[in-house]
Amino acid sequence: MPTVNQLIRKPRIAPVKRNKVPAMQQNPQKRGVCTRVYTTTPKKPNSALRKVAKIRLTNGFEVIGYIPGEGHNLQEHSVVMIRGGRVKDLPGVRYHIIRGVLDTQGVKNRKQRRSKYGAKRPK
């Protein structure tokens, strides 16, 4: 345990808190326009073609967002809403696109966890 003199000479420093979703600027969601929609491969040991989009946000940030669910209708110039939340096996993907909002359609034939994928209740 340090002495009072040691603490006066070299005070304790609080650890720096890094923001995991800086482009959100403390907002729960942000709107943006897709500049590129493409697929990418995950880190080892996983293997797939994950659907992602590069998005220019209203605050000027350019981020990569993951498109969840099976199938999507996004293309260049689609207006999307994003939320925070990274994809563990895709480096650099820190945001999720919200399905069923703005130009993004919900997932077709979704029976369970519908609210997460913007799917309406089946009749």
Swiss-Prot record:
Keywords: Methylation, Ribonucleoprotein, Ribosomal protein, RNA-binding, rRNA-binding, tRNA-binding. It holds the Pfam family Ribosom_S12_S23. One of its GO terms (cellular component) is small ribosomal subunit. Gene3D superfamilies: Nucleic acid-binding proteins (2.40.50.140). PROSITE patterns: RIBOSOMAL_S12. Signal peptide: none annotated. Disulfide bonds: none annotated. One of its GO terms (molecular function) is structural constituent of ribosome. The modification 3-methylthioaspartic acid is found at D89. One of its GO terms (biological process) is translation. With S4 and S5 plays an important role in translational accuracy. Interacts with and stabilizes bases of the 16S rRNA that are involved in tRNA selection in the A site and with the mRNA backbone. Located at the interface of the 30S and 50S subunits, it traverses the body of the 30S subunit contacting proteins on the other side and probably holding the rRNA structure together. The combined cluster of proteins S8, S12 and S17 appears to hold together the shoulder and platform of the 30S subunit. Belongs to the universal ribosomal protein uS12 family. Part of the 30S ribosomal subunit. Contacts proteins S8 and S17. May interact with IF1 in the 30S initiation complex. This is Small ribosomal subunit protein uS12. The lineage of its organism: Bacteria, Pseudomonadati, Pseudomonadota, Alphaproteobacteria, Hyphomicrobiales. The gene is rpsL.
